[in-house]
């Protein structure tokens, strides 16, 4: 009863379109979208340095080469086979 119904919103929308026209409303919509996009980009730029700091504060791990492990494992198995044969 006290709220705005869908019919009242439709009447307001028709009046706004008649007053401003579709071209003006389209321009306002694109300007509003561009400003929101710029705002989100500015907020996102502030968050990126914080994320970079988080990744740089992680523990340092040595990089391991898988091929070295395989060659070491193969050499160890061949040495153990040689010992068994002796």
Curated annotation (Swiss-Prot):
Q: Which GO terms describe its molecular function?
A: protein transmembrane transporter activity
Compartment(s) of residence: Cell inner membrane
The protein's matches in InterPro entries, at most eight in alphabetical order, are given as: TatA/B/E, TatA/E
Any single Pfam family the record assigns to this protein? TatA_B_E
Q: Which UniProt keywords apply?
A: Cell inner membrane, Cell membrane, Membrane, Protein transport, Translocation, Transmembrane, Transmembrane helix, Transport
**Keyword Cell inner membrane assigned:** yes
What is the membrane topology listed in the Swiss-Prot or TrEMBL record? Single-pass membrane protein
Main localisation: membrane
Give the UniProt entry's GO cellular component terms: TAT protein transport complex
Which region ranges are annotated with the description Disordered?
42-86
One Gene Ontology biological process = protein transport by the Tat complex
List the biased-composition ranges (Polar residues).
47-58, 68-77
User: Is Disulfide bond included in the keywords of this UniProt record?
Assistant: no
Instruction: Give the stretches traversing the membrane.
Output: 1-21
Q: What does this protein do, in the record's words?
A: Part of the twin-arginine translocation (Tat) system that transports large folded proteins containing a characteristic twin-arginine motif in their signal peptide across membranes. TatA could form the protein-conducting channel of the Tat system.
Q: How does it assemble?
A: The Tat system comprises two distinct complexes: a TatABC complex, containing multiple copies of TatA, TatB and TatC subunits, and a separate TatA complex, containing only TatA subunits. Substrates initially bind to the TatABC complex, which probably triggers association of the separate TatA complex to form the active translocon.
The record's section on PANTHER family has: SEC-INDEPENDENT PROTEIN TRANSLOCASE PROTEIN TATA (PTHR42982:SF1)
> Which protein family is named in the record?
Belongs to the TatA/E family.
Its recorded name reads Sec-independent protein translocase protein TatA
Gene symbol here is tatA
């Amino acid at each position: 009863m006290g709220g705005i119904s869908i019919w009242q919103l439709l009447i307001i929308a028709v009046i706004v379109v008649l007053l401003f026209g579709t071209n003006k409303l389209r321009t306002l919509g694109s300007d509003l979208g561009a400003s929101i996009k710029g705002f989100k980009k500015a907020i996102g730029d502030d968050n990126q340095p914080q994320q970079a700091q988080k990744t740089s504060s992680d523990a340092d791990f040595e990089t391991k080469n898988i091929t070295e492990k395989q060659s070491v494992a193969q050499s160890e198995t061949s040495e153990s086979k040689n010992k068994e044969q002796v």
